[in-house]
Amino acid sequence: MARQQAPPWVHIALILFLLSLGGAIEIPMDPSIQNELTQPPTITKQSVKDHIVDPRDNILIECEAKGNPAPSFHWTRNSRFFNIAKDPRVSMRRRSGTLVIDFRSGGRPEEYEGEYQCFARNKFGTALSNRIRLQVSKSPLWPKENLDPVVVQEGAPLTLQCNPPPGLPSPVIFWMSSSMEPITQDKRVSQGHNGDLYFSNVMLQDMQTDYSCNARFHFTHTIQQKNPFTLKVLTTRGVAERTPSFMYPQGTSSSQMVLRGMDLLLECIASGVPTPDIAWYKKGGDLPSNKAKFENFNKALRITNVSEEDSGEYFCLASNKMGSIRHTISVRVKAAPYWLDEPKNLILAPGEDGRLVCRANGNPKPTVQWMVNGEPLQSAPPNPNREVAGDTIIFRDTQISSRAVYQCNTSNEHGYLLANAFVSVLDVPPRMLSARNQLIRVILYNRTRLDCPFFGSPIPTLRWFKNGQGSNLDGGNYHVYENGSLEIKMIRKEDQGIYTCVATNILGKAENQVRLEVKDPTRIYRMPEDQVAKRGTTVQLECRVKHDPSLKLTVSWLKDDEPLYIGNRMKKEDDSLTIFGVAERDQGSYTCMASTELDQDLAKAYLTVLADQATPTNRLAALPKGRPDRPRDLELTDLAERSVRLTWIPGDDNNSPITDYVVQFEEDQFQPGVWHDHSRFPGSVNSAVLHLSPYVNYQFRVIAVNEVGSSHPSLPSERYRTSGAPPESNPSDVKGEGTRKNNMEITWTPMNATSAFGPNLRYIVKWRRRETRETWNNVTVWGSRYVVGQTPVYVPYEIRVQAENDFGKGPEPDTIIGYSGEDLPSAPRRFRVRQPNLETINLEWDHPEHPNGILIGYILRYVPFNGTKLGKQMVENFSPNQTKFSVQRADPVSRYRFSLSARTQVGSGEAATEESPAPPNEATPTAAPPTLPPTTVGTTGLVSSTDATALAATSEATTVPIIPTVVPTTVATTIATTTTTTAATTTTTTTESPPTTTAGTKIHETAPDEQSIWNVTVLPNSKWANITWKHNFRPGTDFVVEYIDSNHTKKTVPVKAQAQPIQLTDLFPGMTYTLRVYSRDNEGISSTVITFMTSTAYTNNQADIATQGWFIGLMCAIALLVLILLIVCFIKRSRGGKYPVREKKDVPLGPEDPKEEDGSFDYSDEDNKPLQGSQTSLDGTIKQQESDDSLVDYGEGGEGQFNEDGSFIGQYTVKKDKEETEGNESSEATSPVNAIYSLA
């Protein structure tokens, strides 16, 4: 019956259990501990598995072991007990298991060949050695043979076989001549891995020597030579060239197996004329460049330390100019067992749990066999505290009786591995392993470690105390390692004292004491300076030192980094070095080295000796000046929580004294790689105390400055991280502003690295409505903004933003007032229209009841009307404080409709509408026409009445508070027409067809009470725009026009007083711009921001059609034709002739009259400028616009433009406006075409 496989969760549970088992105890190497503790045996030395010996020497088979008590040894041979006492040649060394087989009294070593295994035993278990295979080295003689000369054709391949006698180990093969000269080898003649000598092609010169194969045997150190070969080469007139063919291996493919970890050697030897070249490749990949190398003139490929990924197909390519051939070698990589997890000795306390793991891999996969004390585990006595789970043995609740030695044997067909691991159960009270009452002396602000090695079973718990106090030292400035060492990160004066370490387990406790003394650092506070001296003078180099008085100070001098010999001309004192009678050989660098037994400090200076007495003694005046060299050898000392001392060695000042040192720092958390200035120090110092911020990983560098300039920065110092602390400040620039009507965005400037003070800097954002008793809302944010949603429209909020890190919160933050988002305001209240006389209309209003934000002004739109006729719509823009306005009536018989709305940043709100009273001379009052939709700004600046209505219904349009400059475009038609006025930013649309359309509109305006800018007007073209505005500033005031294109490029144009209108040039066709005008003296007084768009650029080849030569010629030809027709007409009438009349009133032109359907030949030219959006056709003519209607369209109801009697009107007119008649009266137009039909 097949065994049922366990579910996956069982394996997972087993793995988790194994991971939960406690770690084993490690026995220290202390000899006293090793001698006192009982321990099962452990094999410490043994012979190799394949042990080959020299038959001329005694045989030695090693086996050594340790244990307490000392183990005894015995051997097996070929799996049977080997009785050493019965063989007089075999002995065992004392206190060792090493076997010695002595052949001095005779005997054959071959009789002792076999498989040996050593057993080491004491009362706690038995350990086993590997199975050692003993073999005796052999070097057999070469069989005697007579070799005939080898006859070969010139150019043919040849193989000389060696066939050495089998030896143990295999001999080393090499070829020589009978005169003991080595055979020269190259890519044509070479020796194969099997020892044979291969000739890719034989040449006549190969007969000049003979060839002898030699075998060298390693153990016997002997060389045996085979009888030599002699060659006889048959010559021909010409050696035929041949394509390559393989001499070794044969055929096109072969296979090879190699073991993991061994070297793979692939070989290809080819024949051919000329000699082929060999190249190597791997199918599906590249050769491993790090462990592949070519040998034997590229005929062999060696891959060292083979692994599984080296398996695959390799092929060698042999080629010459006649062709190429390929041989494929399939490589399979197998593996003898190798360790993944070798079992280790396990030392436990009574009652503890543990495990032994024996995990190995191989190809094929090896099997695992457990043994205990040299016997299979299956035949060993049962142990309820032991459980075997494949490659793991689990021990639970171990006792003293559980001690034993376990063997793990893992094997496959290619080899085996054997490992011993003992299980020892100890109950040992804590013991201290170091000397008692040690004295440790350290330098102030340095880092130090106090050691307290201990041992015990179970593993003791270690605690540290200072000066007998009860608090345990761990955390903050202290850190306790698992081995018992106490690290003090930065020594201070108050850390001096007696430290006690206490180790405790269930069997007792042990303690030891360490006395710590803190010493002041050694510092050179007055360093020697660079000097220039004349030959023969006296020089003194100062070196004053401050050190701890309890330490012995030694001051020594170096010259050019070598110890200085103090001769008769020198005097060395405690704080100086004096040189009398300076000579040229005294020039060089002098180093003062002040040292104690704990630390040292160095200072260096350079002495320059001037040989010429006339040379100035001032080196700086005699040599050119330059920037100083960079400082070097930066050192951090006096490490404190909020400060550190930085010391550096100045560089050469290059003949200009150093005036300043700039210390910079870099931190690697917020802005890695960015250097910031920290502080500045005078050039006379080379050491400074730097005040630091908490929790910054500092790195410093120093820059020297003289009158010439700054040096290159020094190399960075080592990093120093300060300890953390709660923030001492909060973020700045806290604001609360709405981005939508129902939210408020809280923003602030984030804190930098030097103000974070700790890890995980974050911000606690609080808010609540102002002047309410609501509880604070709060949220933690890691960025620099937070959006509060679902807020009422434009209400004040109290806002607080507080910094926090892992060490705590910052100070209580200030309360900032912010506002939620604005919305469209309600309509102005009490909008009143009064008419004191016929010339003036007064308007008054009150502020909106719900402004829903900050009012930025009012927009008034009004339009005169008389009956069903509408005038031009006017637009006025007012400041937010203005509540009155007067309109001067241009037409005393018209009424006015007014629409007033307030504005916030969001836009214009609901409008209040009123009408002026009816004038007294209005005979028949008529109902006012429907209210026109507000004028809105589109992207093109042109909005029809239909478009404006749709736009007002679907979106909140931005109304531009300016008076437009208009360019009219009139569509001529006899039906109810629409006049569309094209403006830069506004459009007025009416349903009435006035007789004419004016090119501008005059607006009656009233200036605001305070200083302001209003009525900004923009008239754009494709590449320029004219700007005008109104203001009430004093005369001579300067302004600035600021405009921004759609690419966010901002430009400004200063405007001198009374310089209007202003033209903006270099604009881009078809681009949208925003514009405002503000006072140059007070930027806070600005106009409303408006938007306009330039028109599309015209093509370069566009020209006025009326100036084209072909058009003038055509007109002249038509005029001449008309004149001729008129003459013919008058002649025929004078003769009484008749001409047919074609009725045109109700019948359109037929197909036999195609030219009448081409439209009229009328030409409209308004100021020689094409309409916006028109383009020139390819042939230079103007494309027919939508106003160029057919002849039928010029009549009402499809009537033609002839009199009813069909008479011809001999006139030719050019239209200037497309609407020349009103009502339904038909117009009569004449053309040459009419004249042609009148003659028919």
Swiss-Prot record:
SUBUNIT field: Horseshoe-shaped homodimer. Probable constituent of a NFASC/NRCAM/ankyrin-G complex. Associates with the sodium channel beta-1 (SCN1B) and beta-3 (SCN3B) subunits. Interacts with GLDN/gliomedin. Interacts with MYOC.
Protein's UniProt name: Neurofascin
Record topology, Extracellular segments: 25-1110
Membrane topology: Single-pass type I membrane protein
Modified residues (Phosphotyrosine): Y481
Segment forming the signal sequence: 1-24
Region annotation (Disordered) ranges: 710-740, 902-942, 1141-1240
Domain Ig-like C2-type, residue spans: 41-137, 143-230, 244-332, 337-424, 430-517, 521-603
Modification sites for Phosphoserine: S485, S1160, S1174, S1187, S1190, S1226, S1227, S1231
Function summary: Cell adhesion, ankyrin-binding protein which may be involved in neurite extension, axonal guidance, synaptogenesis, myelination and neuron-glial cell interactions.
Biased composition (Low complexity): 907-916
Sites carrying sugar chains: N305, N409, N446, N483, N752, N778, N866, N881
Native species: Mus musculus
Polar residues bias spans: 1171-1184
Membrane side Cytoplasmic: residue ranges: 1132-1240
Record keywords, A-Z: Cell adhesion, Cell membrane, Disulfide bond, Glycoprotein, Immunoglobulin domain, Membrane, Phosphoprotein, Repeat, Signal, Transmembrane, Transmembrane helix
Start-end of Acidic residues biased regions: 1154-1165
One GO cellular component, as annotated: axon
Transmembrane stretches, start-end: 1111-1131
One Pfam match: Bravo_FIGEY
ATP-binding as UniProt keyword: no
